[in-house]
A protein has these predicted regions:
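Feature for soluble, non-membrane regions of globular proteins
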Residues: 1-158
Length: 158
């Protein structure tokens, strides 16, 4: 399978608080790089003889596939969310209030988690726990989680 770089869905020149140069660079280098990297890893996996390949090779490629895939998907969700009004819809507001008490408490915690991401590389996501029936912030390295799909809980927040 070959992955394609999606068209940037917002106009970077019209975003408030983010420079056009920053958005274009992040889109081309980080997102575009993740897609290219995922395609390279996919090609390696397609040509790999799993019956004879050493376990560490399989493990390494599958780990890198997971990281690149999540990076691609999370960047797509991020860029698709830019240019909106920044306010959660009523259903999301209700869910946040139910889980955190009020929007301000959630926003304070969410922003603090973003500032705590070391080196400026990583994500903070608002996810939904089906087990606990609550919204939960998750930070740091969600690239290492099982693959996200637009149908997963994170799509609810885009």
């Amino acid at each position: 399978m070959t992955y394609e770089i999606k068209t940037l869905s917002c106009n970077p020149a019209k975003l408030k608080g983010l420079s056009e140069k920053l958005i274009v660079s992040h889109y081309e280098n980080n997102y575009g790089g993740a897609v290219k990297r995922l395609n390279a890893i996919t090609a390696q996996l397609e040509s790999l003889d799993f019956a004879t390949a050493p376990g560490f090779v399989i493990n390494g490629l599958k780990r890198e596939e997971l990281i690149a895939s999540n990076s691609m998907i999370l960047h797509e969700l991020y860029f698709d969310g830019l240019g909106k009004d920044g306010e959660p819809d009523k259903d999301l507001q209700s869910a946040i209030v139910e889980s955190f008490g009020n929007l301000n408490r959630w926003q304070t915690q969410f922003v603090a988690m973003g500032k705590a991401v070391g080196g400026g590389s990583g994500w903070v996501l608002l996810t939904y726990s089906h087990r606990d029936k609550t919204d939960q912030p998750m930070g740091r390295r969600p690239h290492l989680l099982s693959r996200w799909r637009k149908s997963d809980s994170c799509s609810r927040y885009v």
